[in-house]
């Protein structure tokens, strides 16, 4: 049936990659079964599955046995099987150092070198090259490669060249010994030209020593006049550039060579020269550029005859501008020449790629000049030219679907100038919004880019709006009066463009094909919500989002609601969550959305003093709303809703999605609201619970002056303990969030500081000598966290309203408690911006441990003889996953902490006394560094006494900055120490004989 349906049928299990069904040994047995098959296709199919097996189970024992097995089949199999073994070695490069018997592996496959089949020998040479990283100094292999270079078979020689390139990159001795051999082959008349072109790139790896690199450079320079053909010149220049960029010593000389070849009339040679310039302009080698080289390079711009060469030339200037040292030199000495050069490229109406690249060069120069003090006047003319041409380039590239990359370049560098000059940013926002809001049709990709650019501009101005007085870009007037008031916040120019953005959003939603522009709808919605962060949304904005409910799918609606929660617009979020929760089919999703809806409703009560149901029916009433809910009632209702959200979230969690961070965060938030409720209770109780008559004598006896104010003093101190408990809980949640994004970690830092600050304010009231105030370590690098931090700054300013009293004459009055209530009002009326990690996991890092010895069953302990040491071996695998191109943080090392605690002491006789000073708890720590995502460690646990011990292994992750994260797994087992019969106590002597009677033996 298989040949009729076209379905491939395998005789061994194909579902071995399912981790829940098989372990590594079972998978290896399945693959071994395929290798032993008589059909070559099944054998090859089994071989190609090994790289995935190594990724899933990167244990040295498994990898070693697998490669030994593959070596046997490499020797006995066909060339097709050898080819797939070669592919396995190439794809499993990260796991080659886990081959324990690498000598046996090489010895086994090296037998093929004596074969009469040149293809088999070629496959062997390529396999040896693939594993060269773990056998760099194998002299036998070096000799085999040298002999293979003299072969008369082209396939074998090409394989030997490949192996030479691999070994030259790993072995210094091989590179030195092969230098003369390769030189002779290149100059030999018997070696064909294509083979010589393959030999030249081998020389680029010979940079292990300065003498070798110098020798190879001279060899290449000697080859240039001997082989003036285009292909040879291109290959030699590329090789010389690679050598110079790695040694850095030869960069000035290589620049002179490249400048000479810029005058070559052959276009491919000039393009290679420009690419070499671009390589040498990188971060590693740009500091080695001499000053005359930059001037000589700019003078040779006229030699670039076509658009591709001009684009490459501008790319070199862009890289030079990114380095502060060379950028300053360009502005001081070559500003006029650069400006003339870039204007010439921008004026080309038929090549927008080159024009936008020239605009990028000018933008980098402007941004650098504006940020550097005293250099602003140098870039005024450049900024004028940027203002003159930016709008034209934006309009020309936005309407062409083939210019998406060019449009991205214009928008990116426009945002870069905005971060250095707010005035330019205001005009740039007007340009982009006017272009987006006109009636012209844009390709969907270009429209999305402009929406993303507006979001980036809005983020920058929101950061400026809520910037601290000590933050960057905030000019402090020395002549201003010193007052307690905060400086007025800066205005976000995006607010003035909000009607135009809303009009564009409504236009897209009303279109019949709005499903094709969902991404633009999401970005524009995010832009509106970010612009109005901290504000009460106008009715037109709410009506626009209500219109989305009937036009968009559930996933897009959820993303909009998620953005609303992240920017503190909880009414819109609750409205969308409630609607979507009634549509979804999955129970887990339903309860998750219900929990989010309850969270948003709780925050609505805290922020606005009105229930969500009332706001839904009377969002913009024509008459004054009913009296707001009192503060105590608000906190009580919000706490109840958070408890309901906790129950809903537990119902929505599953073993695959445990929602650990979400549950912990909701617990802390509910705990914090209950603490605020306690503070309001203390304020209300002060009126009805006056100090007792004996309060003065109690204060004198306890030597605590503030005890004379009675009940309120103890309640405030109890409140301080509750706030410090919240602070510690936030700190623990921070330490356990290794995979969280930067916004979430900043949010947790600010939340922790808010608890510490509020506790310090109350301490300054209820203690005679309060401790030092907490230090604010972050001001927020994102709009939502900086807005949160700005509320903490308002709390610090509010603290100044406390009466200034000496330590020995402090009082606790209504004025003090009114300040506490005002602090709570600031906390509750500041919209909560839920952290991103609450909704999205952009990075996942898991550690899977294997601990030995293991008990026979989960209920049985591990038996150990008394007086011996227990050897505990730990092996683990790191599994990474990231949706971003760059990880937020990586695992540098893993700390293993082993704790042994006596839980059941051994039985003792009535006359035996316990040992004095005996420690029943042992803690051992070890830091291991993962090798290719595999870690191993061992402990020698001393156990001297009998009984039962609880052995617990905890894992902590240490990132590249040395920060320890409590995010690893935890495993435990029970160890039973067996009593040694030979060491049991002898029976007590008989007391039947009379005292003093001599015993006879």
From Swiss-Prot:
Main location: nucleus
Single GO biological process annotation from the record: RNA polymerase II transcription initiation surveillance
Bias kind Polar residues: ranges: 989-1001
Disordered: region residues: 980-1001
Record's keyword terms, sorted: Cytoplasm, Nucleus
GO cellular component: cytoplasm; INTAC complex; integrator complex; nucleus
Database matches in Pfam families: INTS7_C (PF22965), INTS7_HB (PF24437), INTS7_N (PF24436)
SUPFAM superfamilies, sorted: ARM repeat
Subcellular compartments: Nucleus; Cytoplasm
Assembly information from the UniProt record: Belongs to the multiprotein complex Integrator, at least composed of IntS1, IntS2, IntS3, IntS4, omd/IntS5, IntS6, defl/IntS7, IntS8, IntS9, IntS10, IntS11, IntS12, asun/IntS13, IntS14 and IntS15. The core complex associates with protein phosphatase 2A subunits mts/PP2A and Pp2A-29B, to form the Integrator-PP2A (INTAC) complex.
Family under the similarity heading: Belongs to the Integrator subunit 7 family.
Protein function: Component of the integrator complex, a multiprotein complex that terminates RNA polymerase II (Pol II) transcription in the promoter-proximal region of genes. The integrator complex provides a quality checkpoint during transcription elongation by driving premature transcription termination of transcripts that are unfavorably configured for transcriptional elongation: the complex terminates transcription by (1) catalyzing dephosphorylation of the C-terminal domain (CTD) of Pol II subunit Polr2A/Rbp1 and Spt5, and (2) degrading the exiting nascent RNA transcript via endonuclease activity.
Additional observations: The name 'deflated' originates from the 'deflated balloon' appearance of mutant abdomens.
Protein name: Integrator complex subunit 7
Gene source species: Drosophila melanogaster
Gene: defl
């Amino acid at each position: 049936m298989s040949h009729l349906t076209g379905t491939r049928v395998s005789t061994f299990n194909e579902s071995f990659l399912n981790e829940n069904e098989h372990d590594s040994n079972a998978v290896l047995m399945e693959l071994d079964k395929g290798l032993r098959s008589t059909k070559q296709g099944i054998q090859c199919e089994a071989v190609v599955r090994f790289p995935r097996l190594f990724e899933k189970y990167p244990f040295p024992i498994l990898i070693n046995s697998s490669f030994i097995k593959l070596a046997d089949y490499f020797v006995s199999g066909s060339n097709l099987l050898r080819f797939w073994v070669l592919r396995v070695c190439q794809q499993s490069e990260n796991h080659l150092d886990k081959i324990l018997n690498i000598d046996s592996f090489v010895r086994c496959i090296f037998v093929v070198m004596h074969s009469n089949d040149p293809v088999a020998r070629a496959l062997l040479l390529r396999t040896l090259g693939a594993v060269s990283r773990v056998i760099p100094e194998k002299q036998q292999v070096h000799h085999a490669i040298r002999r293979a270079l003299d072969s008369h078979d082209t396939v074998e020689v090409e394989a030997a060249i490949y192996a030479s390139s691999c070994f030259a990159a790993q072995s210094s001795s091989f590179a030195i010994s092969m230098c003369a051999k390769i030189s002779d082959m290149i100059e030999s008349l018997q070696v064909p030209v294509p083979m010589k072109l393959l030999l030249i790139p081998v020389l680029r790896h010979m940079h292990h020593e300065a003498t070798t690199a110098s020798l190879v450079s001279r060899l290449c320079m000697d080859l240039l006049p001997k082989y003036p053909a285009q292909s040879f010149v291109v290959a030699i220049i590329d090789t010389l550039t690679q050598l110079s960029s790695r040694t850095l010593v030869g960069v000035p000389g290589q620049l002179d060579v490249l400048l000479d070849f810029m005058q070559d009339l052959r276009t491919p040679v000039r393009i290679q020269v420009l690419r070499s310039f671009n390589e040498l302009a990188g971060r590693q080698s740009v500091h080695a550029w001499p000053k005359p080289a930059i001037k000589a390079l700019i003078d040779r711009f006229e030699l670039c005859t076509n658009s591709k060469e001009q684009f490459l030339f501008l790319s070199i200037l862009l890289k030079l501008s990114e380095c502060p040292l060379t950028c300053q030199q360009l502005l001081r000495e070559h500003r006029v020449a650069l400006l003339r050069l870039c204007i010439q490229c921008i004026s080309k109406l038929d090549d927008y790629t080159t024009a936008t690249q020239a605009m990028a060069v000018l933008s980098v120069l402007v941004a650098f000049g504006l940020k550097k003090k005293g250099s602003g006047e140098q870039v005024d003319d450049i900024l004028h030219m940027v203002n003159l041409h930016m709008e034209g380039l934006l309009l020309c590239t936005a309407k062409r679907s083939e210019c998406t990359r060019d449009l991205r370049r214009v928008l990116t560098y426009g945002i870069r100038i905005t971060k250095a000059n707010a005035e330019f940013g205001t005009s740039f926002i007007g340009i982009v919004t006017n272009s987006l809001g006109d009636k012209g049709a844009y390709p969907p990709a270009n429209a999305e880019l402009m929406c993303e650019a507006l979001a980036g501009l809005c983020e920058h101005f929101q950061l400026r709006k809520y910037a601290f007085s000590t933050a960057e870009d905030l000019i402090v007037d020395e002549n201003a009066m010193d007052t307690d008031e905060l400086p007025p916040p800066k205005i976000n120019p995006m607010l003035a463009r909000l009607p135009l953005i809303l009009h564009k959003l409504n236009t897209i939603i009303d279109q019949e094909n709005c499903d094709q522009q969902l991404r633009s709808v999401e970005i524009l919605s995010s832009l509106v919500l970010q612009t109005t962060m901290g504000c009460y949304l106008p009715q037109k904005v709410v009506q626009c989002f209500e219109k989305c409910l009937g036009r968009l799918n559930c996933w897009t609606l959820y993303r909009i609601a998620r953005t609303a929660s992240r920017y503190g617009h909880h009414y819109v979020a609750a409205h969308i969550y409630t609607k979507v929760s009634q549509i979804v089919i999955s129970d887990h999703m339903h309860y998750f959305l219900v929990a989010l809806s309850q969270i948003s409703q709780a925050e609505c009560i805290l922020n606005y003093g009105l229930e969500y149901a009332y706001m839904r029916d009377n969002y913009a009433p024509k008459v004054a709303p009913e009296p707001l809910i009192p503060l105590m009632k608000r906190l009580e209702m919000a706490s109840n809703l958070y408890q309901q959200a906790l129950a809903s979230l537990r119902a929505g969690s599953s073993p695959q999605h445990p929602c650990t961070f979400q549950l912990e965060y909701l617990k802390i938030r509910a705990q914090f609201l209950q603490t605020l409720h306690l503070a309001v209770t203390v304020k209300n109780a002060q009126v009805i619970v006056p100090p007792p008559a004996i309060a003065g004598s109690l204060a004198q006896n306890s030597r605590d002056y503030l005890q004379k104010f009675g009940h309120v003093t103890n309640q405030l101190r109890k409140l301080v303990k509750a706030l410090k408990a919240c602070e510690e809980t936030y700190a623990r949640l921070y330490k356990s969030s290794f995979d969280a994004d930067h916004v979430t970690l900043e949010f947790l830092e600010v939340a922790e500081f808010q608890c510490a600050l509020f506790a310090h304010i109350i301490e300054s009231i209820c203690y005679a000598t309060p401790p030092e105030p907490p230090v604010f370590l972050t001001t927020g690098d994102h709009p939502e966290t900086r807005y949160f931090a700005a509320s903490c700054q308002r709390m610090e300013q509010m603290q100044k309203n406390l009466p200034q009293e000496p330590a020995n004459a402090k009082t606790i009055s209504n004025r003090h408690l009114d300040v506490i209530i005002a602090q709570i009002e600031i906390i509750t009326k500041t919209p909560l911006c839920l952290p991103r990690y609450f909704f999205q996991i952009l990075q996942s890092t898991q550690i899977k441990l294997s601990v030995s010895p293991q008990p026979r069953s989960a209920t049985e302990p591990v038996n150990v003889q008394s007086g011996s040491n227990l050897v505990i071996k730990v092996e683990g695998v790191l599994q990474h996953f990231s949706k971003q191109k760059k990880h937020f943080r990586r695992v540098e090392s893993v700390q293993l902490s082993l704790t042994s605690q006596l839980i059941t002491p051994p039985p003792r006789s009535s006359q035996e006394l316990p040992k004095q000073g005996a420690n029943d708890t042992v803690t051992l720590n070890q830091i291991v560094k993962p090798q290719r995502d595999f870690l191993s460690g061992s402990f020698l646990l001393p156990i001297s006494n009998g009984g039962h011990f609880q052995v617990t292994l905890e894992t902590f992750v240490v990132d590249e900055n040395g920060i320890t994260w409590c995010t690893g797994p935890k495993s435990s087992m029970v160890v039973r120490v067996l009593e040694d019969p030979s060491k049991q106590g002898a029976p007590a002597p008989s007391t039947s004989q009379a005292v003093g009677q001599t015993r006879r033996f």
